[in-house]
Amino acid sequence: MSVNHVARIVPVIKVNNRNLNQDFYVKTLGMKSLLEEGAQLSLGDQTRTERLVLEESPSMRSRRVKGAKKLARLVIKVAKAAEIEALLARGIQVDNLYRGEKGYAFEATSPEGDCILLHAEEKLICLQPVQETPAFEVQDDFIGLSQFDVEKIE
C-alpha cells in the first residue's frame, strides 16, 4: 500500500456554534464526540472511527453566504435499526418519521438548518411516512450509535 492511498473520506460541515451543534449531533442523532481540537469536532460511533467533522466558523469572523445552502440533506445509514427506535424513545424532536422494511427512520433539522435523515434501509424508496408516532420502548443500555456511515450528501 502506498502512502498516497485514500482509505476514507470524512465530510466536514462548517457551523457557527460548535457547542449547540455538538448537543444536537450527540443527543438527537446518537453520535459520539471523539476529539475536540481547536475549531474542529470529530464525531463517530462506538467503533471510535471518525465519520463526520464539524468545523466552527463563526459568522462574525467569516463572510456569511446569502441564499440557498449547498447542503440540502445529509443521509446517514445506521447498522442497527433498533438504535433508531432507542433514539426516538428519548423523545427527541423530529421533523418527519418514516417506516421501512428494517424499522423506523427520521429526519431532523440541525441548529444550522441542515436536514439530516437517519435510516437503516438498503434503499430509501422503501421508506413510507408515518402519520402517528408510536410509543417507543426505552432501552436502558443504549449509549449511542454502534456503527453508522454518511451515505450521501445531497
What are these regions (language model features)?
Residues 6-15, 61-154:
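Vicinal oxygen chelate
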